[in-house]
Structure formats: structure tokens, C-alpha cells
From Swiss-Prot:
SMART domains: HhH1. This is Holliday junction branch migration complex subunit RuvA. It is found in: Cytoplasm. Gene3D superfamilies: 5' to 3' exonuclease, C-terminal subdomain (1.10.150.20), DNA helicase RuvA subunit, C-terminal domain (1.10.8.10), Nucleic acid-binding proteins (2.40.50.140). The gene is ruvA. The RuvA-RuvB-RuvC complex processes Holliday junction (HJ) DNA during genetic recombination and DNA repair, while the RuvA-RuvB complex plays an important role in the rescue of blocked DNA replication forks via replication fork reversal (RFR). RuvA specifically binds to HJ cruciform DNA, conferring on it an open structure. The RuvB hexamer acts as an ATP-dependent pump, pulling dsDNA into and through the RuvAB complex. HJ branch migration allows RuvC to scan DNA until it finds its consensus sequence, where it cleaves and resolves the cruciform DNA. Keywords: Cytoplasm, DNA damage, DNA recombination, DNA repair, DNA-binding. Residues 148-198 are annotated as: Domain III. Has three domains with a flexible linker between the domains II and III and assumes an 'L' shape. Domain III is highly mobile and contacts RuvB. GO terms for biological process: DNA recombination; DNA repair.
């Protein structure tokens, strides 16, 4: 098992980043790839969790150990796989997540992609009281980009689709942000907050 990787960030896509270490490029699935935009071609440390399947070895990466801890707690719940856990971590509202679990707020938990009533109830059952202290929000850097606003919005929509949100949900998000100019990272953060409000 890997704990973390330290290397040069060489590539960002809507679903993953690539970190080169010792001549190898590691494809790492992350919650919001564009939150790493400010680190392209720089040395980064990414906290890792490895998932070994019959057909693939997958790496999931996190900015902080707190993010990784939330992810590990989520995948311990029956019905939550790594992709769904990553989508929950992407919302970057760990305090809201912990409060919803501790207060049995099933409706809030059901706003996450692929979380139905049964899984939300299981989250409460398995995780209530497991977070001793609410993890801090990661507050990723608000880096600006020279790319056009629509290109950034397209990248954000692609990343949200990868997290499991539907085209119907994202059509409303696109309409809401049309004409604005933000980085893909900021679009993703703002869109996730809107999606959680319902």
C-alpha cells in the first residue's frame, strides 16, 4: 500500500492527474483535478489510497490527510465505492457532511450523487460519532487562468459528469454560470454548493 507520493505534476484531466516520480507517471483519481492547476510542473505531495481490482489497480489522491481520512471512512460504508466517496469529498464541505451524519439528516446525504435513502441511513448508522473533530475544509487555491471562461466551464462540467452528476443536473448549472468567467476549479466548487442546495 502507498501512503503518499511526492513528484512532479505533469498532467491534469477532468478525472485524474498524473504525477511523475522516479521516471514513472502515476495516474491518480482526485476529487477536483482542477484544484491542482496552480501546481502543474511543480513538485507536489499527494496522499494516496490504492484500490486493487481484478481488472485494474487504481490510485485515489488527496490534498490532505484529513481528506483521505474522510474518504476512507466513507468507503467503509456498505454501498459506497471509491468513485462515490470521491464525489462526496469533492463537495469540500466536510463540516456539513459530519453534521448531517451526526444529526441523521438523510435528506442532505441523499443530495450526493448515487446516494439513495438506504445508503444514507447506512452512513448514519456506520459513521455517527466516528468523526471526533470535523475535518477542516481544504480551501484549495483560487488560481486564475488565462483560458476563456467557456472553456473553463466545459472542463468543470466534464469533471462533474465524472463525479456522477447527471447531464440534466448539469444543464441547469451551465445555464446558471453562462457568461461568467472563473477557473474550472471555482466553477466546480460553486456548482457543487448549488447542487447540494437542491
Amino acid at each position: 500500500m502507498y501512503d503518499y507520493i511526492k513528484g512532479q505534476l505533469t498532467k491534469i484531466t477532468a478525472k485524474y492527474i498524473v504525477v511523475e516520480a522516479n521516471g514513472l507517471g502515476y495516474m491518480i483519481n482526485v476529487a477536483n483535478p482542477y484544484s491542482f492547476t496552480h501546481s502543474v510542473n511543480q513538485l507536489v505531495t499527494i496522499y494516496l489510497h490504492q484500490v486493487i481490482r481484478e481488472d485494474a489497480h487504481l490510485l485515489f489522491g488527496f490534498h490532505t490527510e484529513d481528506e483521505k481520512d474522510v474518504f476512507l471512512k466513507l468507503i467503509s460504508v456498505s454501498g459506497i465505492g471509491p468513485t462515490t466517496a470521491l464525489a462526496i469529498v469533492a463537495v469540500d464541505d466536510n463540516e456539513g457532511l459530519v453534521n448531517a451524519i451526526d444529526n441523521s439528516d438523510i435528506k442532505y446525504l441523499m443530495k450526493f450523487p448515487k446516494i439513495g435513502k438506504k445508503t444514507a441511513q447506512q452512513m448514519v448508522l456506520d459513521l455517527a460519532g466516528k468523526f471526533v473533530e470535523a475535518p477542516q475544509e481544504t480551501g484549495h487555491t483560487k488560481a486564475r487562468s488565462n483560458k476563456a471562461g467557456n472553456t473553463q466551464l466545459d472542463e468543470a462540467i466534464e469533471a462533474l459528469l465524472a463525479l456522477g452528476y447527471t447531464a440534466t443536473e448539469l444543464k441547469k448549472i451551465r445555464a446558471f454560470f453562462e457568461g461568467t468567467s472563473e477557473t474550472a476549479e471555482q466553477y466546480i466548487k460553486s456548482a457543487l454548493k448549488l447542487l447540494m442546495k437542491g
